Amino acid sequence: MPIKLDNVSYTYAPGTTLAVQALRGVSLEIGDGEFVGVMGCTGSGKSTLIQLIAGLIAPTQGSVLLDGEDINAKKYDRDALHRKVGLVFQYPEYQLFETTVERDVAFGLRHSGLSREETAAAVKAALELVGFDYDAVRDKSPLGFSGGEKRRIAIAGVLASKPRVLILDEPVAGLDPLGRQDFLNMVDALNKDGITIIMISHNADALAEHARRIIVLRDGALFRDGSAKEIFSDYFDLIHNGIGVPQVRRAAQLLRDRGVDMPGNIILYSQFIDRLKILMWRKNK
């Protein structure tokens, strides 16, 4: 389900003294099954971008197309849009409120027209997608789980409607290292199942490890668009513009600055360790 933004701009409070242009002339396409990371400083337009893709707001200028159709056209089926595109805001676990996991995950399906059996099947499938045993957790309170588990339950509530696109806003914020890795592995699995992932994150390490394409916004405009290796290899330009880079890329650059034979395109821990092994082997020859 290709997503296309054609010369999209968005202004908050247009025509007033409080007007702020959040996006300006953004054009891009996201293909079926992609895993796209979105980066940028605070105020760069990231949250506005994903709200436009999800159809929560309409562009001031330009168009947003899904499968070639303008999602803001009067005749466009908005209910179908919200089934196709799932949006998970930051800290979604704070929105858990039902008495059981099953009821919470099923909440968004109340007006879907599904029978009780169909709803139960959708809830079961969604919970299994995020790594839960349906029978083991269905009757438990969602509030009794760990932070990472609560977040997975909240995402199951979005997945229950079987979206083809999943948008995640800072999904690993506040998680401990183990919870963060488990969560990202789950997102990888969803992507392998064919779900298009669009993930906003300030965590450059997470994007380097998992996103196959990264979009960088600056001052509401498209600043960079490429593979993780392409984006993070341009170390000094990113740092100059206040955009984060993976910690391992920083470490590699520190060694390069001290004369160590360290390539400038290392962005993964595995690459860094492999290079250190080579350097140690050379030293001990």
Residue spans of the language-model regions?
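The feature captures the beta-strand-to-loop junction immediately N-terminal to the Walker
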Residues: 39-41
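Conserved catalytic motifs of ABC-family nucleotide-binding domains
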Residues: 162
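Conserved ABC ATPase signature
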Residues: 141-145, 149
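Helix-to-loop junction immediately C-terminal to a conserved catalytic motif
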Residues: 54
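Conserved ABC ATPase "signature" C-loop
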Residues: 219-220
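Catalytic Walker B motif of ABC-type/P-loop ATPase nucleotide-binding domains
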Residues: 166-169
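ABC ATPase NBD Q-loop/coupling interface
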Residues: 63-80
